[in-house]
A protein has these predicted regions:
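His/Glu-based metal-binding/catalytic segments typifying zinc-dependent metallopeptidases
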Residues: 53-116
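Charge-rich, well-structured scaffold segments of protease-associated domains
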Residues: 1-54, 92, 98, 114, ...
Length: 251
């Protein structure tokens, strides 16, 4: 509450001017429209304003997570958890895309629905259909998220860490890698059926300054060796943390 109280109208205005700035904007339109129609709407809606380059400070981000564990009590019926792996910042352009594809491949191998870990967790009742994984990344940040509902989130995390260590020791099976690679490429192609998804993807690629064709090719060109290297450098215990939301105790 103290931090909210310290926000002034002047600070909000500064944030608004910095964030909602044409120099910081990308417009992507997908659908049955022409460029002339889009530009006509832009000329009508967008007001002339002074633009300035957005300056972002360079932050020396530590490799390790700040806290290993965070726990809160909120009005939920079942405990919810999220395990995160903090990424090393600095990847841009195609390097960031390839890093994302490598991580997606590893997440499927580690805890996708066809993985041994997923089967064990589900059979033992430690996870349900809410279990999901995601890799989020952008300019200067990246994080892998694994979570869902579980009555024993710490046990899930322990089994996940064991699975990571086991895969690191044994290496990635070439046949499994090829199968997952084809699956992810097919998923990437299937998303082109959604106009909304295409627009969102093109916005992401515009900020990364990556061509769509190069993005699609990354799913086929990423190799097994670089995925194993990614496993060794990204899925490390010191960069991991867990956040748990417990139900509020009933009086």
């Amino acid at each position: 509450m103290d931090t909210i109280a310290s926000i002034t109208p002047e600070l909000l205005y500064t944030c608004y001017q910095s964030f909602y700035n044409p120099a910081n904007m990308v417009l992507v339109v997908c659908g049955d429209v022409t460029a002339a129609q889009v530009l006509a709407v832009c000329d009508k809606v967008l007001k002339p304003r002074r633009t300035a380059a957005v300056r972002r400070p360079v932050i020396d981000e530590p490799r390790a997570a700040v806290r290993d564990r965070t726990e809160l009590a909120l009005p939920v019926s079942t405990p919810q958890f999220m395990v995160g792996y903090k990424d090393v910042p600095g990847a841009t352009g195609m390097e960031a895309v390839r890093r994302a594809v490598q991580t997606e491949l590893l997440l499927e191998l580690l805890c996708g629905q066809s993985s041994r870990l997923y089967g064990e967790l589900y059979t033992q009742g430690l996870i349900n259909s809410s279990f999901e994984t995601e890799y989020m990344y952008g300019d200067g940040f990246g994080v892998t998220l694994i979570g869902g509902e579980s009555r024993e989130p710490d046990r899930v995390r322990a089994m996940l860490l064991d699975a990571v260590e086991s895969l690191r020791r044994t290496g990635v099976c070439a046949a499994d890698f090829e199968r997952i690679q084809k699956k992810l490429y097919g998923r990437a192609v299937r998303q082109l059926n959604s106009v909304d998804r295409v627009a969102s993807l093109f916005v992401d690629l515009a900020f990364l300054q990556v061509d769509f064709a190069d993005y699609m090719q990354a799913y086929l060109s990423v190799g097994l060796d670089e995925c194993e290297q990614r496993l060794r450098t990204h899925f490390v215990p010191e960069a991991s943390a867990i956040s748990i939301i417990q139900p509020i105790e009933k009086a």
